[in-house]
């Protein structure tokens, strides 16, 4: 079943990417995209940013105004600042509650679309072979392991295929990360060396 074979491989790649990047990072990016959409939450986010700018501006004006020489003006700014701060905190709490609900929804959806789907496929297709091995190619003991737990003898079960995919994806991913780190390291060393040489030349000129 090629479609099931590819689906399991694709799911393992997605799970590895999420675990490598970090679920919190993925959730943060999705939140930034969500508040750009024309929704009620995006309206709350825009109002929160506007109120924050207003609070900062009023605080700056208060700092620039003398409470002794211009007390009337300073007191008026203080009242406006306190009122704006109260409105900002209320709006910020509303946005925080919306984000908490969004984070919980995303966590459930992410689990259902990755690990949850993988568990469902392993249960539903536990008797379905991913592919069939050539007759007599390997000993029956190994065939039994590869067909574990419920696939026909002489085939590879979805559980074994999923474990193999997870292992290979992790090995390939780690190898790619190590290669990128090795390639980028000489560039960083050259930048540091160039900065050191420029510093020494500057000292000699002085």
Swiss-Prot record:
Presence of the UniProt keyword Endoplasmic reticulum in the record: yes
Domain of life: Eukaryota
Bilayer topology term: Multi-pass membrane protein
InterPro entries linked to this entry: Get1, Get1_fungi, Helix_hairpin_bin_sf
One of the GO BP terms on file: tail-anchored membrane protein insertion into ER membrane
HAMAP family (UniProt xref): Get1
Protein name: Protein GET1
Designated gene of the protein: GET1
